[in-house]
Amino acid sequence: MSSVLNPSSPHSWDLCCSSSSNRSYHRPTHPIVGLLVGQLSVVLLIGAFIKFFIFGEAPPSPSRSQTHRTSQHKRSYSIHGARDLSPRTLKEKPSSNVLRPVPSSSTNTRSILRKTYYSANPTNFPSKHGRHRPHHSTHQPESLDWFNVLIAQTIAQYRQTAYILKDSPTASILESLATTLNNPEKKPSFIDEITVTDISLGEEFPIFSNCRVIAIDDPNSDGGRLQALMDVDLSDDNLSLAIETNLVLNYPKPYSAILPVALSVSVVRFSGTLCISFVPGTTESSTNLTPTSSNIDTNLRSNELRGKTAPQESSTTDEGSQGGATSTTGIPKTSLAFSFLPDYRLDLSVRSLIGSRSRLQDVPKVAQLVEARVHAWFEERVVEPRVQVVALPGIWPRMGRTGVRGQEEQPDVSSSDAAGVSGAKVSMLGSRDTGAEMLHAAREVDAEGLRYRRNPPPGDKGSSSKYAQQNQSSRERGRADDPFRIPGSLPDAVPIT
């Protein structure tokens, strides 16, 4: 008992040493265990993040608008779409079969109407005058306010362009009308040269409304094709054309008598139903829609008779006559066909002035003849069953059609076509892109001069001087075209004394 209580005894010293040694042996184990637990928790967190955030499936994105209309329609997948759900490998098929075939049901009229949630009645086609008269669809007619704004902007741009190019010798609307009216193959011999005295492109815009889509039968397409019908109305506009000419009596000798005639035709009101449909770009349709060889030969002969005064117009006519629904490379394009139903309304106001001394004004018979001729011209071109077919341009993005909206105002456009095109290009690209193009051209000039910087043969001083002159001239042109060059010369160096 005394040995235990006495700290100076040897047995008590041994017990104290053994207990202290045990505490010092177990004390370092706690930091190691904590370090291992911390590392393990970090690894687990990283693994959970990779699994659930990186390789996890993305949640379905909510729709932008939960309207009553979208909640009613449920997409039904066809049997053709079930095969696409199976996983595909990158090298499952050869490279020649990369483009998947389009099933015939995807271009069917019923499939298009079902996928776009548009209801249309199956149409019956009682024919009248060789024209099919379809029933209207059960879908409610739609307003075309946005379309009216788009068409109004397009017409306004055409009017502005026609006014800017009014003094152009080749691209003006006045020159085009004069050339068309004085066509020697269509103008009779008793009519002298026709002069256009006044043109008014109007100030109002057509209003489209009551748009509906119908399905009609078409033997060239599977399941028929779709056609859009819309009402168009244009009234209270000053769309007019005034001309002057002479009626020539060529008997018993040429120009035996001359009767001056002045006519003015104005559109008071136009209303009708516009039909729009798309013609697929197949080889058969492009063959049927392109003009015949006889028409092309007739156009070529008429261009030869005009002479060399309008070469640009003749080339444009040839391209337009040969283009049709087929591109210049021979690949058929999808075309837009539009026409008007026969129940259209075209009210004209015709004013006439005949004679030089004793003049007859507003002759009713002349007005009747002019109105009949205008109606016949309109019906021969855009009234059912005749349609106008326009090849749609390619909408694939290309660098040649890429532009940047200019930050500066559009400069004044001169009368020449080149100045008008260049001014429009400068305003579209902006000053920054124009400067970049000029700098690029200057660099090309310098690069062109590098080709001639080879060492000339020994003893040939003429070639070396020629190369030096070429390099010097190219550098001067490059400096002159450089828009970032600081004008003026640098100050002279100050000598250090």
Swiss-Prot record:
The lineage of its organism: Eukaryota, Fungi, Dikarya, Ascomycota, Pezizomycotina. It is found in: Endoplasmic reticulum membrane. One of its GO terms (molecular function) is lipid binding. One of its GO terms (biological process) is protein insertion into mitochondrial outer membrane. Residues 81-94, 440-451, 474-484 have a biased composition (Basic and acidic residues). This is Maintenance of mitochondrial morphology protein 1. Belongs to the MMM1 family. PANTHER family: SMP-LTD DOMAIN-CONTAINING PROTEIN, TEX2 PROTEIN-RELATED. It is a single-pass type I membrane protein.
